[in-house]
């Protein structure tokens, strides 16, 4: 959309753009839930007066999940009062039934326990906004406690093999999404410590990527400027893989990471630490696990989960989600919304105890 919007405005392309201004043209737009809500879409529509627009998305913007803009995907792709703006619906359940994507296995790990809380507070309800509001609980210091972060990093380090090396055969890759850059830096350092302490054959190749503000100030109490952290991560990456990326070659760094997650003839990245990048629109069949220490809702949740469920080798039987926050209600709400008010459990494997009982009986 950026290229077309620029072409419409740039005098250099005026002759070409004007030639199509009054012609019947069709724009086919992928990932239309996230790219068409700004000014650029309007500028393009204004120029091409007779154009039609067809958008594809796995996670439309509905009334329930619309943003501050107030519009839905149907509003942006309005087809007139007599027509349904949605031409066709192909739900996740259809894709699963057709064998085009996999179901999800979701595992929740409790990381905040009663010993860290005031008397009478139930740790199992801490991620419920209403419960926290009623009991005046601020989750932020609990989530970002250094001891908790170290514990989660250790849990991932110790159990990563079982997630990405199913049946002792093929090896897959993983994302670890956290809530902000400062948290990412803490996890990155914890993984470095764990690697330093581990035998060579047990070490994990951990990389990190995030967008940063070039003119960032330090008023938020950050321990390290985000650009300095990114530069440090890139230097470690260069040492690990024999590359030479710098801040001003960020896009090449991003592309190299993508190739390694996809296992494209390069030594792979085992775990990629992210905040928002790679959680939408990135497809890598060898990626089978998403670790989460981040609250996600609606389309952001489904998009993030869907990084893991692309069909690959026979040993990849489902996409794995390991969440260190209790986002089950948000998960169920999102899966219900994007299934046309269906059953969210259609997309999920049962828990471990269910399959044990099935086997016993």
How should these model regions be labeled?
Residues 1-29, 34-43, 253, 274-276:
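Conserved RecA-like ASCE ATPase "motif II neighborhood" in helicase/translocase motors
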Residues 7-25, 48, 249-269, 284:
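Short basic/glycine-enriched coil/helix segment immediately N-terminal to the Walker B
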Residues 31-33, 278, 295, 308:
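Conserved Walker B
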Residues 31-35, 47-66, 99:
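Conserved helicase ATPase motor motifs in RecA-like P-loop NTPase domains
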Residues 66-171, 188-203:
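Interdomain helical connector at the RecA1-RecA2 junction of SF1/SF2 helicase-like NTPases
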Residues 136-274:
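Conserved C-terminal RecA-like helicase domain
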Residues 273-274, 278-295, 300-303, 319-323:
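A short beta-strand element within the Helicase C-terminal
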Residues 312-361:
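Long, hydrophobic alpha-helical segments
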């Amino acid at each position: 959309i950026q290229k077309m919007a620029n072409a419409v405005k740039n005098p250099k392309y005026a002759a070409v753009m004007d030639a199509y201004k009054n012609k019947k043209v069709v724009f086919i737009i992928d990932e239309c839930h996230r790219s068409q809500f700004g000014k650029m879409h309007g500028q393009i529509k204004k120029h091409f007066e007779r154009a039609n627009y067809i958008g594809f998305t796995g996670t439309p913007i509905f009334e329930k999940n619309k943003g501050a803009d107030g519009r839905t995907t149907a509003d942006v792709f309005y087809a007139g009062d007599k027509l349904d703006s949605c031409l066709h619906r192909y739900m996740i359940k259809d894709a699963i039934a057709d064998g085009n994507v996999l179901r999800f296995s979701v595992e929740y790990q409790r990381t905040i326990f009663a010993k860290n809380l005031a008397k009478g507070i139930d740790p199992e309800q801490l991620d419920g906004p209403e419960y926290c509001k009623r009991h005046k609980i601020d989750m932020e210091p609990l989530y970002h406690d250094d001891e908790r972060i170290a514990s989660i990093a250790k849990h991932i380090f110790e159990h990563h093999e079982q997630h990405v090396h199913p049946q002792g055969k093929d090896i897959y890759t993983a994302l670890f999404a956290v809530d902000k850059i400062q948290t990412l830096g803490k996890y990155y350092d914890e993984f470095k410590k764990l690697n330093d302490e581990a035998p060579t054959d047990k070490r994990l190749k951990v990389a990190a990527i995030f967008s940063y503000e070039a003119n960032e100030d330090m008023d938020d109490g950050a321990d390290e400027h985000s650009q300095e952290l990114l530069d440090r991560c890139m230097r470690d990456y260069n040492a690990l893989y024999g590359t030479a990326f710098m801040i001003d070659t960020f896009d090449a760094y991003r592309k190299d990471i993508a190739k390694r997650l996809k296992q494209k003839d390069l030594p792979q990245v085992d775990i990629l630490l992210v905040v928002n990048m790679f959680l939408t629109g990135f497809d890598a069949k060898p990626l089978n696990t998403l670790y989460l220490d981040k609250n996600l809702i609606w389309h952001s949740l489904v998009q993030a989960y869907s990084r893991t469920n692309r069909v690959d080798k026979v040993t990849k039987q489902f996409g794995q989600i390991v969440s260190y926050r209790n986002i089950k209600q948000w998960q169920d709400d999102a899966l219900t919304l994007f299934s046309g008010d269906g059953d969210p459990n259609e997309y999920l494997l049962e828990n471990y105890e269910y399959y044990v009982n099935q086997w016993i009986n």
